[in-house]
Amino acid sequence: MIRKIFALSLGAVLALTPVQAFGKTVSITNVSYDPTREMFEQYNKIFEEHWKEKTGEDVEITQSHGGSGKQALEVANGLDADVVTLALEYDIESIENAGLIKAGWIDNFDNDSSPYTSTIVFLVKKGNPKKIQDWDDLTRDGVGVVTPNPKTSGGARWNYMAAWAYADKKYNGDETQMKDFIRKLYQNVVVLDSGARGATTSFVENGQGDVLVAWENEAYLSMRDYPDEYEIVTPSVSILAQPTVAVVDEVVDYRDTREVATEYLNYLYSDEAQEIEAENYFRPTNEKILKKHSDVFDLSVDLVNISEYGGWDEVQKKHFADDGIFDEIYER
């Protein structure tokens, strides 16, 4: 009789075990760059629902935002991040070089671990009083430019390389003339913030400068918040900006969060997430969803791929390392 009761009790415990697992909470931290704040605020809500439905677990997601280069340095120096969603491949490579992410991470998710893309545009005051149409106009006397610092901001490096790509086409690859062009542009910079969101604040809220060189999504968010005050100008040449994502292996193995961290990044490619990315003015990598939003995104702009300049390792060494071209042309 006692054995029978024990067996029944054990069976009851085993039957309850899966249900009790449904009360578990797991937590992860996503270290990201400046202009993704609003997008991840929305995305995290749908991912929490997705994870609960899939596993029965609750998930708590902590966000950290800042200039991409600075964020990468923080993670490399010990900021615990289960996942990183940064502005460019090079910033994640710097975390890999610190021994926290395994080699080959770029192949772990589709499209070189880039679930969405963007490009670089200009935000100007309503009516475009300075008549800014293309990169040439940013080198004119009397035009105040706002852009972040490429030493700390991934978006700023995309801004710089978009201008470099324009100069490359304009001067047929003559680097002397290209450097002069970039020098003139940066001589017109009135404030060089540490990150993209800080640059937006300087231009939109503090009224500094005549033109903000910005992520496309950041410019559209400003338009959404201040519909009667600003307008967007898309230059003739820009860059295919590819923000990238990765699981931080050292952290997830220590915290036992690999499964949820991997799914967190995988789900960025889902149709539901791609719609949220488009709503926040990032370009979905799902072509069908991108075309659905063609009334928002200019799909005709000439987007140069960073691979044309040897990829981010080469670009970083040539342009943004100490004594690189940026240091050469930016005299402040």
Which role does the model predict for each range below?
Residues 23-152, 295, 300-302, 330:
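N-terminal segment of the mature folded domain
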Residues 31-33, 124-126, 144-171, 185-189, ...:
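Short beta-strand->loop
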Residues 252-332:
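Extracellular/periplasmic juxtamembrane helices and adjacent flexible linkers that interface
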Residues 171-236:
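Ligand-binding pocket segment of bilobal, Venus flytrap-like solute-binding proteins
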